Structures are given as C-alpha cells and as structure tokens.
C-alpha cells in the first residue's frame, strides 16, 4: 500500500490533520512495480474517464503529484496481500469508474481509500477498523474514509517514508 501527499485542495481541506491525501496499492506488472489507484482528473488519453488506473510507481510519486509519500506493508500473510493486489488489478482491467459521491456502500465505483479497503476486506482484512472522518464543508458533508484514517491503522507497518 502506498500513500502520498499531493496538493489537491479538496483533499487537504478534507484531511487537514492527516499526513496524506491519496492512496494506492503496489502491484507487479511483468518486471515493473506499478500502483493501482482510483483518481479523478488524471486522464491517460483524451476523453478518458475518471477511474481506477494503474501507473508506474515513479509516476505515482513524481514531484508534480506528490510532496511526500510512504510505502507501508499490510500485516497479513503474503498470499493475502498478493490476492488483494490481484483484485485491485482486476478492478483496473474492468475500468471501474471513480466514485465522485464517495459512497462506501456502493462498490460499483471506487475512490482511493475505498479501493484499498475493498480489496483487503474481500481477503478478510479490515485495515481501517471502521474509522471514518466527519467532514463538514459546504457541499460535502458526511463520514468518509480518508487516507489519514488508514495511515493510522495498527494493521500497517511503515517501510519507507519521505
């Protein structure tokens, strides 16, 4: 699992106490390390939808997108983590759309933390422990699962942070 801090004003406003504003899962594609994540506003081609995407880890962490970042490992058997990564890749291949309503109850569309929580819950691992953050900003009210909520999870071990 990877987290990063970008400069998205909505993410920073929503997660002002959090250290990170985005999250993805590391997967292997041939000999390359990639990150699968759900993201709006980063089309790969003209007319591309906001959706789950897969990109090289270097692109995910490039300075234009990330001011800081971390690589964390889920405290689970490696077969569980590999299966979660395969599930994330499958969502990418299905071209699952980005969830602009941030609805955790609807898995037909995904936002970044929802994607990670979803693939690990299918493996019977509850990373967030049900932790949600209450957000009350104009036009955006409710309880949401933010990267900062997951960053605090006892089920994660820090591997590297910058």
Map each language-model feature to its residues.
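Sec-exported extracytoplasmic/periplasmic mature domains
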Residues: 28, 40, 76, 89-93, ...
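Short beta-strand-to-coil "C-cap" segments at the C-terminal boundary of structured domains/repeats
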Residues: 73-76, 162
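Activation targets extended, charge/polar-rich intrinsically disordered C-terminal tails
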Residues: 100-162
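N-terminal targeting signals for Sec/Tat export/insertion, comprising classic cleavable signal peptides
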Residues: 1-4, 153-155
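Residue-level detector of flexible, active-site-proximal loop/helix-junction positions
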Residues: 42, 78, 134
């Amino acid at each position: 699992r990877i987290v990063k801090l970008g400069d998205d004003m909505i993410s920073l406003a929503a997660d002002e106490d959090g250290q990170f504003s985005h999250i993805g899962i590391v997967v292997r594609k041939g000999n390359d390390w990639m990150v699968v994540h759900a993201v709006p506003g980063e089309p790969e081609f003209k007319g591309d939808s906001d959706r789950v995407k897969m990109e090289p880890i270097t692109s995910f962490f490039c300075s234009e997108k990330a001011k800081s970042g971390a690589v964390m490992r889920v405290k689970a058997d490696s077969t569980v983590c590999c299966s979660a990564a395969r599930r994330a890749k499958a969502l990418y291949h299905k071209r699952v759309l980005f969830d602009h309503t941030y609805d955790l109850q609807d898995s037909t569309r995904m936002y970044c933390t929802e994607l990670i929580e979803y693939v690990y819950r299918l493996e019977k691992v509850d990373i967030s422990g049900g932790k949600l953050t209450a957000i009350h900003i104009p036009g955006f009210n409710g309880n949401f699962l933010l990267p900062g909520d997951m960053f605090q999870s006892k089920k994660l071990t820090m591997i590297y942070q910058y």
